[in-house]
Amino acid sequence: MIQPQTHLNVADNSGARELMCIRIIGASNRRYAHIGDVIVAVIKEAVPNTPLERSEVIRAVIVRTCKELRRDNGMIIRYDDNAAVVIDHEGNPKGTRVFGAIARELRQLNFTKIVSLAPEVL
């Protein structure tokens, strides 16, 4: 469950290392975001000499959460960290690699480019 002021790791090589959620896209006063939701975030930590800089406002899609994700078949998936992938306004990832496992639900939400870049899909 991601809410405003939550810090997330970045799961790609776009140049950002840590994000802070400032808004959840989709509804006017939605409180929590889950896997597959798009958020507006600010970069809190970035790699030097990359296109993304600290304090830049970007969009990201959540790919991992510590809160459990319950599937229709009863399976529960939980990750060790909260992580997101930086995207542009069309929903394409800004990085060329994705690190770590991501959930299968992203494919159903039309984030197929992120799924194809991921080393492991759970």
From Swiss-Prot:
CDD domains: Ribosomal_uL14. Signal peptide: none annotated. It comes from the Eukaryota. GO terms for molecular function: rRNA binding; structural constituent of ribosome. GO terms for cellular component: chloroplast; large ribosomal subunit. Its main location: plastid. Keywords: Chloroplast, Plastid, Ribonucleoprotein, Ribosomal protein, RNA-binding, rRNA-binding. Belongs to the universal ribosomal protein uL14 family. Part of the 50S ribosomal subunit. This is Large ribosomal subunit protein uL14c. It comes from Citrus sinensis.
